């Protein structure tokens, strides 16, 4: 509540007019968790990025019950498969149930189409080299999506729906 009030004063607007993404960004900058992922510590350079991507729903976490604790994991070391990507809400790309690993060549083409950048520009920005044999981790995919497409910059309402 304090963060929202401070942002309202800073932006000169009513509390109800403070943007959700502004609240989330302020909380991240203060070191807060938006999602309870255990993959990375707050000190990790990829922490904020993973939180942003998780909030968009483009990559989903899994929950695990360990003893009396509920845990959430983004499985950042796992190989990205097509079924992992939920691009429909943000980009109109239908979800695939395929369990096939995403090849880096396919991923670069996908990002190229979504960003309207040439494949070589996608590679230059993300560092992902296209290959028919090479796959990528969920962490590398999240990094590339965050860096190139910036989905967290799209505003949402208080229910999480895109505006």
Tell me the role of every PLM-derived stretch.
Residues 1-14:
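Internal hydrophobic alpha-helix adjacent to the cofactor/substrate pocket in enzyme cavities
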Residues 2-5, 27, 145:
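Short amphipathic C-terminal alpha-helix that caps PH/PH-like domains
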Residues 6, 29, 36, 120-124:
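Polar/charged alpha-helical tracts
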Residues 31-56, 62-68, 109:
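Acidic, Ser/Thr/Pro/Gly-enriched interdomain connector segments
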Residues 55-163:
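Terminal recognition/anchoring or ligand-binding modules at protein termini
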């Amino acid at each position: 509540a304090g963060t929202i009030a401070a942002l309202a004063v800073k932006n000169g607007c009513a509390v109800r007019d403070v943007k959700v993404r502004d609240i989330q960004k302020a909380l991240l900058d203060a070191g807060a968790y938006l999602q309870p992922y255990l993959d990375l510590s707050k000190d990790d350079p990829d922490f904020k990025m993973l939180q942003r991507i998780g909030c968009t729903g483009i990559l989903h976490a899994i929950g695990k019950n360990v003893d009396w604790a509920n845990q959430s994991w983004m499985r950042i070391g796992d190989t990205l498969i097509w079924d992992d990507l939920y691009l429909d809400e943000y980009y109109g790309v239908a979800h695939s149930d395929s369990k096939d690993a995403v090849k880096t060549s396919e991923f670069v083409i996908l990002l190229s189409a979504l960003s309207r950048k040439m494949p070589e520009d996608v590679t230059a920005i993300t560092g992902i080299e296209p290959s028919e044999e090479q796959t990528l981790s969920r962490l590398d995919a999240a990094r590339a999506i965050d860096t190139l497409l910036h989905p967290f910059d799209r505003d949402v309402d208080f229910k999480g729906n895109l505006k």
